[in-house]
Each structure stands twice: as C-alpha cells, then as structure tokens.
C-alpha cells in the first residue's frame, strides 16, 4: 500500500506526493510542515532551499510551491530517491531538483558554491537507519564546514532531548 501526502500551500497546493517506506524514512508531519511555511513564507523568495535528508522531497516541493528561488532535495536511500525524483518531476518546475547521495559529503560544496543565500533544512532519519547513531555529532561537524555568509538559516528537526551547543549559535 502506497502512502501519500499533499502540498499544503502555495502554487502547488493540493498536489499529491508519494511517501517512501516508513522503514527507511520518517516524513515531516503535516502540522510541522504547515507551521514552518506559515512562518517562513515571506522570507523564502530570494533563497535556495536545501532539504538535506530529502525522503520524499516534500519540504523542497513545499518550498518551491511557496516561491523559493530554487529548491534541492538530497536523499541517500535509492528507493526513497526514486520516489523523490518522481514527486519533483510531477511539479514540472525547472528550479526544483533531486540529488542522490550522502548529505554529509555533498552539502558543504553544494552550499558553499551557491550564488545566493541558503535556507538549509535538516530532518535526519534519527532512530530509523543503521549508522545514524552519531547523527548530531555529524551535523555539528557538517555545519563547521559551511561558509557563514552563504547561510540564511539552518533548521533542524531533532529529538527533543538533544541540545545543540555553541557551534550553531552563529547561525539564524
């Protein structure tokens, strides 16, 4: 049985997107997605939105629907990536793309090579995939590799019991 979600606002509001298997991804809850874009909508127009752990690409799709200059979803899991590609292609937006690969390896060069500012959205598959036990330490290391002047904002979805240190205090 396939699972679906819908784009909640913007140009593509109501467009149905497929969700990958719950065994490899954890989709952002609709209430979180809607609340996030209600807050950020007026700021997103000049930004490149990068979804570091794309899953279905729903956040990148929502970003382009709400007027982001460009949106990119990165997904490592091959099966999830195929769904991401299909979802993004269904929107027929030239400013929306999917990349299959490791976010930790790809993000520093991708962000540091951008012409404009980036809104980086990170919702890693903590507690789901093998090898993600030290996910937050990896994220802190990733952030240390980014040029501050390229970042407009970094958004993390994380377990509520984890507290980031001063490493991210320089970012909005």
Model-derived features: where do they sit?
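S-adenosyl-L-methionine
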Residues: 1-66, 77, 82-115
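Accessory RNA-recognition modules of RNA-modification enzymes
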Residues: 2-9, 19, 98, 119-123, ...
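Short, glycine/acidic-enriched loop or turn micro-motifs at the edges of active sites
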Residues: 54, 78, 105, 126, ...
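Short acidic/polar active-site loop segments enriched in Thr and Asp
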Residues: 69, 94, 152
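Conserved SAM-binding motif I beta-strand of class I
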Residues: 70-75
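S-adenosylmethionine
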Residues: 114-172
């Amino acid at each position: 049985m396939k699972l679906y979600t819908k784009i909640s606002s913007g140009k593509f509001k109501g467009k149905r997107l497929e969700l990958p298997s719950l065994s490899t991804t954890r989709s952002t809850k609709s209430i979180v997605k809607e609340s996030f874009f209600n807050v950020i909508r007026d700021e997103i127009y000049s930004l490149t939105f990068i979804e570091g752990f794309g899953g279905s690409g729903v956040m990148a799709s929502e970003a382009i629907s709400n007027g982001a200059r460009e949106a990119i979803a990165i997904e490592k899991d091959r099966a999830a990536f195929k769904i991401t590609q299909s979802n993004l292609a269904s929107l027929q937006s030239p400013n929306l793309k999917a990349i299959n690969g490791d976010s930790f390896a790809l993000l520093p060069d991708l962000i540091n090579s951008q012409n404009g500012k980036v809104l980086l959205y990170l919702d890693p598959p903590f507690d789901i995939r093998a090898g993600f036990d030290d996910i937050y330490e990896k994220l802190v290391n990733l952030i240390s590799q980014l040029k501050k002047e390229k970042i407009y904002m970094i958004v993390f979805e994380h377990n509520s019991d984890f507290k980031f240190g001063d490493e991210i205090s320089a970012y909005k």
